[in-house]
Amino acid sequence: MLALTVAASASAHDVSSPAGHAAEDAVTLSAGGEQRLNQQTLDASKAPALVAAAATAGTPADIGQWGPVVDWPVVAINSALLPNGRVLAYDSVGDKATETFPGQTFTRATVWDPSGGGQTDVRLNLGYNIFCSGFAHLMDGSLFIAGGNKDQQLNGIVNTTYFNPDTNQWSGGPNMAAGRWYPTVTALDNGEQLITSGGPSTPEVRQNDGTLRSLSTASLGQPLYPWFDVAPNGRAFYSGPDPTLRGLDPSGTGSWQTYQQRDAINRDYGGHAFFDVGKELVAGGGPSTTSAAVIDVNGSSPTVDSTAPMAFGRRQHNLTVLADGTVLATGGNSSGAGAVDLNAGVYNAELWNPATGTWRTLAAMQITRQYHST
């Protein structure tokens, strides 16, 4: 893992075809049960042509600076910042390990303390595996996790799970109506959590009393890990990865409103981030496009404006909103081929400035970060 410091001037893991995504993830579960893609990492020195093309001159004050590479006990497929400043990360059984556990009975997890770099093993031992789950923070700072991986055929599980950051303890929640694999969980303004996709077309809501409510009149087939954020009107706003923009009213049994097309791109494995109230940046995805767009959902219907393209085409990258409102793009690959292309990793970070609508190329990382990065 590396840390990038940027001078001041915040799983994307999405596909439109569940069958296609299952085929890609099956690669990671074959030939020994649990061989993960982290065993196929490539450092920058092994891709000289791409690194040379991405070379960026400047001081750390201009282009940022990556810290040293350090080993972690897990591949952080999912990670969450906790109220105490520590970071929870978890992955599949067998990740970064020689042994295999095809029974899917636990999940490797760690809590990292950035102040000292220490790691605490907090593996989940509840008899199931939350690899390929979705999560959101509850108002008390704990995490609510939905779904996971049931078997070698990549079926989802019905389990929901809680993580208590004060005690580092896991506990089971209510079972969903159907198993979910790669769902999205979205924290709503009223403290509830919206669970979408992961296989089933009918969303569910975790209510504040801890029970689940089906949005039975809002069934709609969606991509795995759909992009949802909460709009100022309280609706869950859907922005991708496919181009049709929608709003989901999670009250009662639910209802959809369909808006216009965002653009003409299916941004599978793209990135999205709400960088301001009611304003969202989407960038990359699909055939590793460089294009980006800004969606404003503050009005009665969304508006879409183009913004400057990134310097590098990316998919499987991450967008992170920083404290000053800029958006950091890291990782991904530029080939648009399959789940991973180790010869097409994008090593340079880029920083998008909402005031100017432009990107600035930053320092290059040492190791490619693509599929299952966070």
Give, region by region, the residue ranges found by the protein language model.
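Kelch-like beta-propeller repeat domains
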Residues: A12-T374
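Secretory targeting and sorting signals
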Residues: M1-A12
